[in-house]
């Protein structure tokens, strides 16, 4: 079991069904020590308003021993790698995931998708690329993994890509994990929960990790401290309330 989950959605994204409080309760029951709420960026039709992200400072950092990170799953908008998390939002958010979503950036050919994904990493604000194995968005896996290692951006293994979403992702996810391993980069695991019961569900990710013999030393979810250290290296301030997790 990994004690950190880095990708989930609340009722603020209206196609999801749980609240922040629901996730805290579930985390306590499952032994999850730290999680990031990553509702969709505002360019998605059912995403929270900009004010949602600007007001996340009202969230407690720690509830009943469970740490809470303020996140976003931003949208990669174009081949230049622009995302819908900019300006003052950047200072309000602890962890920025970014990925392709069809309502914002329609699937392109492999060259264009690769260009956009690498450009998003190069801009310097993105910490994790979400579900890069989506077969609707073919990429040059080796080039993306090399760029991710160079920019210290984690590529995600998304558990829901094996179950409810993005059918046909498994072979790509396996190839991505192997490419990240060979490039010396980071993997991040995300349940991509849209309901609290899925929190911390990484069983399919764990199978891929075992199959490619991915080193645990390069998985961000191994401990809260590893994830927090990663964010601090990437320029985020230390979060005093989470120092003892």
From Swiss-Prot:
InterPro entries: Phosphatase_YcdX_put, PHP_dom, PHP_phosphatase, Pol/His_phosphatase_N, Pol/histidinol_Pase-like
Presence of the UniProt keyword Membrane in the record: no
Keywords from the UniProt entry: Hydrolase, Metal-binding, Zinc
E.C. designation(s): 3.1.3.-
SMART domains (alphabetical): POLIIIAc
HAMAP family for this protein: YcdX_phosphat
Quaternary organization: Homotrimer.
Protein name: Probable phosphatase Spro_1934
The organism of origin for this protein: Serratia proteamaculans (strain 568)
């Amino acid at each position: 079991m990994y004690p950190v989950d880095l990708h989930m959605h609340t009722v603020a994204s209206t196609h999801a069904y749980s609240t922040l409080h629901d996730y805290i309760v579930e985390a306590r029951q499952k032994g999850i020590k730290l999680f990031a709420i990553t509702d969709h960026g505002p360019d998605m039709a059912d995403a929270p308003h900009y004010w949602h992200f600007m007001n996340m400072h009202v969230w407690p950092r720690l509830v009943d021993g469970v740490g809470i990170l303020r996140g976003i799953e931003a949208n990669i908008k174009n081949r230049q790698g622009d995302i819908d998390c900019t300006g003052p939002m950047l200072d309000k958010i602890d962890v920025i995931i970014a990925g392709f979503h069809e309502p914002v950036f329609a699937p392109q050919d492999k060259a264009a998708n690769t260009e956009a994904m690498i450009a998003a990493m190069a801009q310097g604000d993105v910490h994790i690329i979400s579900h890069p194995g989506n077969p609707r968005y073919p990429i040059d896996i080796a080039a993306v993994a090399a760029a991710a290692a160079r920019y210290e951006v984690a590529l995600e293994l998304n558990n829901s890509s094996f179950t409810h979403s993005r059918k046909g992702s498994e072979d790509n996810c396996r190839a991505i994990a192997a490419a990240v391993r060979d490039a010396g980069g980071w993997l991040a695991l995300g349940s991509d929960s849209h309901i609290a019961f899925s929190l911390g569900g990484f069983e399919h990710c764990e199978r891929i990790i075992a199959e490619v013999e991915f080193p645990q030393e390069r998985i961000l979810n191994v401990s809260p401290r590893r994830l927090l250290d990663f964010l601090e290296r990437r320029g985020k301030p230390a979060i005093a309330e989470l120092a003892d997790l």
